[in-house]
Amino acid sequence: MKRMHECLDHMDEGIGRVSEIFPDLPVQEVVLTRLLLLVGGTLLGELESKLKPYGLNDSDFRTLMMIYSSPTGSATPTELCEYAQQGATNMTRIANVLVKGGLITRATSAEDRRRVVLSITTAGKRLVRKILPPLFPNVHGAFASLSAADKRTLDRLLRQIAVNIDTLTQPDAGP
């Protein structure tokens, strides 16, 4: 990939040309959207490259982390679909990968035999403890030029955008 500043210049020039053709183009919002996608895509690519040696991708790891971080060390596929923003078919694939890797178990719920519960294994916990610390330097580095106040502001703004998008895509979802 070209250096990021070259990508940003190219993006700005392209959006400028499109805005000449479409005068009503919401330029600032388009720029912000492209920036979010560019930054998110870059972060995702870096994460995926770190996870690949472990046979995991972002959605696998995110799911494993959700189970790892739950108070009980377990979750239902339905809960995971909702919070990991995955469809049922992909969640089945993810669960199969994690079960096959010995990172989680799949069992029937003791409270409701119709429900399946996915629980993290000792091997899953061990893998999380192995994978996470080497990710910290890149996470710190991505935000190194931001002050603590900048980070709080960015957090607040991104959360507002997330709620706005949720409202647009699911009109019955209010704040």
Model-identified regions with their sequence ranges:
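Charged, amphipathic alpha-helical coiled-coil/dimerization segments
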Residues: 96-156
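Pre-recognition alpha-helix immediately N-terminal to the DNA-recognition helix
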Residues: 31, 35, 62-66, 126, ...
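N-terminal helix-turn-helix DNA-binding core of bacterial DNA-binding proteins
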Residues: 27, 37, 41-87, 169-175
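DNA-binding alpha-helical recognition surfaces that contact promoter or target DNA
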Residues: 65, 93, 156
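C-terminal regulatory/oligomerization modules of transcriptional regulators
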Residues: 1-24, 149-175
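Canonical helix-turn-helix DNA-binding module
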Residues: 58, 72-117
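N-terminal leader segment of winged-helix/HTH proteins
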Residues: 1-54
